[in-house]
Amino acid sequence: MSSAKLGSASEDVSRRDANYHPTVWGDFFLTHSSNFLENNDSILEKHEELKQEVRNLLVVETSDLPSKIQLTDEIIRLGVGYHFETEIKAQLEKLHDHQLHLNFDLLTTSVWFRLLRGHGFSIPSDVFKRFKNTKGEFETEDARTLWCLYEATHLRVDGEDILEEAIQFSRKRLEALLPKLSFPLSECVRDALHIPYHRNVQRLAARQYIPQYDAEQTKIESLSLFAKIDFNMLQALHQSELREASRWWKEFDFPSKLPYARDRIAEGYYWMMGAHFEPKFSLSRKFLNRIVGITSLIDDTYDVYGTLEEVTLFTEAVERWDIEAVKDIPKYMQVIYIGMLGIFEDFKDNLINARGKDYCIDYAIEVFKEIVRSYQREAEYFHTGYVPSYDEYMENSIISGGYKMFIILMLIGRGEFELKETLDWASTIPEMVKASSLIARYIDDLQTYKAEEERGETVSAVRCYMREFGVSEEQACKKMREMIEIEWKRLNKTTLEADEISSSVVIPSLNFTRVLEVMYDKGDGYSDSQGVTKDRIAALLRHAIEI
């Protein structure tokens, strides 16, 4: 606890301090820019030429279906599938024939199954039955086949016992074989055992796979070169977006005005880029990056620094959504409030009204108000000593985790669909959004509850579960990990059942969940971004791929 002075905050109030480290980037992204495309029209020409070559490879008719399946998968894993969405969809529709697999080996069946399920095609898991021996066991010691099988099992849904058996079998065999493998297969297996492709941030997975594919003897030179050039071109765009966000962050001077809060504008951009990296969503990323930044400041204010009286005043001001309300909140909070209103005004002017869908701003503001209300409830838990039931805690946490808000704002930002009906549906927290939100909450709480307890908080999913069901801390944590798997199966199931309306929510739900899996895989990688998070951001946003 510390007694702090900040703006007009009460001087005698005892306040908590989370001791968040300063930004690990300094002003690097404020000034850094790629020179990859500078005065180099030949790169753009080469990129276009290679893109056409890859397209031709993808669409050419062939009777060699295993090779076509492998090529389609490689294009997607290398991060260039967004160039060929129409062609890939057409190929997958041709491959969606349940009888095709009868001629495939286990490796090809695994890739085929993962590709089709990953794109919403319903494929029964019993396609793997014919690969079991008379004892009902899988039989293969081929590492590449085991890797492909292991990756496929992560698209399982509840009740698929054969995939439960397959994941145990393939993981055990791969762990035993890994020390004997050589690059690049060794790295493919190591990456999969750490974070399977289906649960990985797709941009990060591409960054990992590009050098692995480049080292394969069977690589297609034009595809390998195209993936490298495309990565560097996209990186230049992403750097320019982060540079713009860094300028906005610095202009408001949030780090010095709010020293108790996390200074994480680069980490926030990494979060939003992980959710949708494609060039056509540039404006959406810019808006959502600012939303992550301002939401993080509000979260830290409610969670760490503000008194109950102060945060209640801020909540009331958010409900009013009026610049005149700024005079009714503590001075140190005013920069947050002004920044918040400015973000949504820019969003309305530059993204929503430009598309003639001005009704979207009401959804955006309401979902933001909703998350502030959830922060208010959590502040009341701490300041009043109230201990909610497990269900009550989880109901609020589905909102405070932010994923409902981010999914809805991403839908608005992408603007690809008949939005009003989709937004109405997503606002009800359907199974797809709920599963994504619950995974986020379980992962977050497992990695943060001990640090939060050190600063006086006693309410978390772990502690609420322990208290309500009379189990040990170890048992509660085990239950949370089991629930993550259950919710992943539910999320997989909802993507397979998606209709015209819900299909637009599939990608946001999956991608935001993937970002959480990666951000928190070795701890709270957002609050403490000095280790693996920094390395991943550097790989995606600092270091170009050598060509």
Swiss-Prot record:
A Pfam family that the UniProt record links to this protein: Terpene_synth_C
Spans through the membrane: none
Protein keywords: Lyase, Magnesium, Metal-binding
SUPFAM superfamilies: Terpenoid cyclases/Protein prenyltransferases (SSF48239), Terpenoid synthases (SSF48576)
Binding site for Mg(2+) 1: 299, 303
Induction behaviour: Up-regulated by methyl jasmonate.
Motif (DDXXD motif): 299-303
Binding locations of Mg(2+) 2: 299, 303
InterPro entries given in the database record: Isoprenoid_synthase_dom_sf, Terpene_cyclase-like_1_C, Terpene_cyclase_plant_C1, Terpene_synth_N, Terpene_synth_N_sf, Terpene_synthase-like, Terpene_synthase_metal-bd, Terpenoid_cyclase/PrenylTrfase
Positions of Mg(2+) 3 binding: 444
Substrates-to-products reaction catalysed: (2E,6E)-farnesyl diphosphate = delta-guaiene + diphosphate; (2E,6E)-farnesyl diphosphate = alpha-guaiene + diphosphate
GO biological process: diterpenoid biosynthetic process; farnesyl diphosphate metabolic process; response to jasmonic acid; sesquiterpene biosynthetic process
Top-level taxon of origin: Eukaryota
GO MF annotations in UniProt: magnesium ion binding; sesquiterpene synthase activity
Similarity annotation: Belongs to the terpene synthase family.
Function: Sesquiterpene synthase involved in the biosynthesis of delta-guaiene (53.7%) and alpha-guaiene (44.6%), two structures composed of five- and seven-membered rings. Also produces 1.7% of alpha-humulene.
PANTHER family to which the protein is assigned, alphabetical: (-)-GERMACRENE D SYNTHASE-LIKE ISOFORM X2, OS04G0344100 PROTEIN-RELATED
Name of the protein this chain belongs to: Delta-guaiene synthase 2
